Structure formats: structure tokens, C-alpha cells
């Protein structure tokens, strides 16, 4: 259960950063991991997080070490029952308290691997010149190829996707899925 509170949260790097705002307000850790449910395992097992989620709508908790869609639905129903409000009211209150995040994902399917790798390589070569410059009217705070240092076993996962993080915390993420390309 959650009677002792939430120890921390985690999201995969491409996932909306909305949970970051909540974690900051609750003064709990928020971990940004590579894509792949396996990266939540060490955090869950070490009790560093209570809740986690990823960009493909997988949601879980420390009650089980796997994605649990039924749990997510039941959790939402429990929140609505406790708050005695509509989903719309709950979301409006959330946005007032934590701000509103917008998320848009674009998947490009069936691109030959050599073309996808060439595009990714070209974008990677531009990263160095982006940090500190203006992009879409905002200063680029971070321009990198995301690497993750697991806080439990100190393993490093490199080349997990390109990130541009702007001064208003909006982000542009580009990554190769490894599953949706052909060739």
C-alpha cells in the first residue's frame, strides 16, 4: 500500500515530464530512465520508487515488478472515489497546482535502418552547437544523447536518445526504437 507515502517516482526519458513537477512539489526523487521496463526494476526492488511509467502507457507500482494496466484503472477509480469529483475537475485542479504539460508523440514506421541511422547521426552531430543557442524562441539548456547511470548497480546505459531541453522545460526527444525500423 501507500500508507507510508510515495518514496519516489520514475519515468522513461521520452515520457511527458509532468510527473517531475509533482515530484518536485512533494519533495520526492524523480528518476529519468531509458525506455524499457527493465530500467524500473532496480529502482522498485531498492524501494527508491513507488510509482513508474513509460511512454507506451505502461504504468506500475511497487506492488508488482511489472506493468499493471488493471491496477492503473483501479487506482484512477480509487482517486475519483476518494476525491468525489469528475475526471475533468481532478485534471483542472492538477493543472492549477502543478502546471499543464502537453505531449505529442510521432512514430515514423518502416523507415529502412540505414536511412534512420543516417538521420539520427546527422542530428547527433548538431547537438554540440545547440546548447546555449535559441530554439523556437527559447534558450537550449540541454542538448545531449541521453545516458543513464543506474543509482543501484552503477551500470551505465548510453546512447538512449537525443534530448533538447529548453529554458521553459519543454523538450524535443528523438530516438530510434530498435523495433519499428526495417532493414
Spans of model-derived segments:
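Phosphate-binding and adjacent anionic-ligand microenvironments
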Residues: 3-180
